[in-house]
Amino acid sequence: MTQMEMARKGVVSDEMKKVAEYEGVDVEIVRQKLAEGRAVLPKNKLHRIERPMIVGEGFSVKVNANIGTSQGFSSLEEEKEKARVAIEYGADSLMVLSTWGDLREIRRAIVEMSPVPVGSVPIYDSAVRSYQMKKNVVDFSEKDFFDMVIAHAEDGIDFMTIHVGVTRRVLDRIKSSRRVLKIVSRGGAIIAGWMIKNNRENPFYEHFDELLDIAKDYDITLSLGDGMRPGAVVDASDAQQFEELFVMGELVEKAREKGVQVMLEGPGHVPLNEVEMNVRLMKKIGKGAPIFLLGPLPTDRAMGYDHIACAIGGALAGYYGADFLCYVTPSEHISLPDVEDVREGVIASKIAAIVADVARGNKKAWELEKKMALARKNFDWETMFSLSLGKDVAKKKYEERPYPDKGCSMCGPFCAIKIAEEFS
C-alpha cells in the first residue's frame, strides 16, 4: 500500500509517527491529511529514510535543495559534498538534477547517503542519453519516457517532477503568446521539443494511467511540473501558465483515485503583488494539494543575489499557503552552483520558511523564537548560535570583534538590554 492508501484505511505507518513527532502534532492529523491528499509524505518503498518529511496543509514549510552535475562539472564527490552541506544546514529534501557523467551512479550514490527524501526529473536522463549518442536532445522514443521513470523508481527516488501539463493545446497557445521567454522549464522544453519533432501528444499526459501504475508500485510522490511556468516577472500570471494549471488540477483527482500521492509545482518568477493570487489559485485548482514553488523570485535583477530575492518571495508565498520551497542559490541564472552556493541557498530559503511558519502561527516555530529571545536577554551566546541557521558565521563574527563584558562590540557599555536590566 502507498502512504495515502494506508492513511485511508486507518493504518499509521512508522513514517507517519516520525513526522508527527517532528511537527509536534497528533499522528491522527497526519493520517487524516494524507488520506485527503492535502499532504504528502514522499517515500519510495525501496528507500530507507531517517528523516521523512510531510508536506502540506497545517504543517511546517519545507525546503528542497537541488544538486546535480553539468557538462564539464561532473564530480560525484562534489555532488555528495553538496548533499551533505545541504542536509547539514537544514534542507528537508534533495533533488538530483544531473545532466552529465554517469547519471545513474550519481543518483544511486545520493539516494544511498541521503537521510532525507530525494527527488528527480526522469526526462533529463532521456535527453542526456539522446544528446550523448545522437547530438540531439529530443531524439528518443515514447518508451524512453516511461523506462526512465521506472529506472528512477528502482533507484529509490521518492518524488519525481513530471511535466504532464505540457499538452498540445497548451503548446499551441505558447507559440502565439506575447511572452518574452516562451519556455524556461528544462523538462518542459525537452517535452515540448519532442512533441513538435514527433507531432505527438505528451506521452505523460496521454498515458497518465500508466504513469500512475508505476508511481503506485513504488509509492512515488508525483510532483506535477509546471513546464509553462513564467521565466520572468513580466511574463507572470499569463494564460499559458494558468491553462497548464487547469490541466494539472484535473490530474490531481486521477492520482488521488489511484491512491497515488501528488503535489503541484508552481511559478518561479512572480511580482510580489501577485504571489497571494498565484498561491490561492493553485490551492483552489489543485483541490488543496500541496504546492511546491521554485522561489518565487519577485524580481529578475538580483543576479548574484537571487537567493535573497528568493527568500523574500518564498516567505510571502509560504505565509499565503505554499507548502514546499525549492531553494535558489547565488549562482542561479549564472552558473552551476558550488558547495558554498548550496549552503547560502539553503540558509536563505530556510529563513523564508521560518518567517512563514512564524507568521502562520506554527507552535514549534514560536517556541524557538521564544528561546532565542530569552537567550538574548540572558546574553547566552552559545544558545543563540545553536538556534541560528548560520551559526558558524554568527560565531565567527562574534569572535572576530570580542567584547570582554556582557553584550557585544556593537554597543559595548551602551547596550540597551544591560541598561534596561540595571535600572528596571
From Swiss-Prot:
Cofactor notes: Binds 1 [4Fe-4S] cluster per subunit. The cluster is coordinated with 3 cysteines and an exchangeable S-adenosyl-L-methionine.
Substrates-to-products reaction catalysed: 5-amino-1-(5-phospho-beta-D-ribosyl)imidazole + S-adenosyl-L-methionine = 4-amino-2-methyl-5-(phosphooxymethyl)pyrimidine + CO + 5'-deoxyadenosine + formate + L-methionine + 3 H(+)
Gene Ontology biological process: thiamine biosynthetic process; thiamine diphosphate biosynthetic process
UniProt GO molecular function: 4 iron, 4 sulfur cluster binding; carbon-carbon lyase activity; zinc ion binding
Keyword Cell wall biogenesis/degradation: no
Amino-acid positions noted as binding [4Fe-4S] cluster in the UniProt annotation, renumbered to this chain: 408, 411, 415
Superkingdom in the source lineage: Bacteria
E.C. numbers: 4.1.99.17
Name of a matching Pfam family: ThiC_Rad_SAM
Protein residues bound to substrate: 66, 95, 124, 163, 185-187, 226-229, 265, 292
This protein's pathway: Cofactor biosynthesis; thiamine diphosphate biosynthesis
Binding positions for Zn(2+) per the UniProt entry: 269, 333
Function: Catalyzes the synthesis of the hydroxymethylpyrimidine phosphate (HMP-P) moiety of thiamine from aminoimidazole ribotide (AIR) in a radical S-adenosyl-L-methionine (SAM)-dependent reaction.
Similarity comment: Belongs to the ThiC family.
Descriptive protein name: Phosphomethylpyrimidine synthase
Gene that specifies this protein: thiC
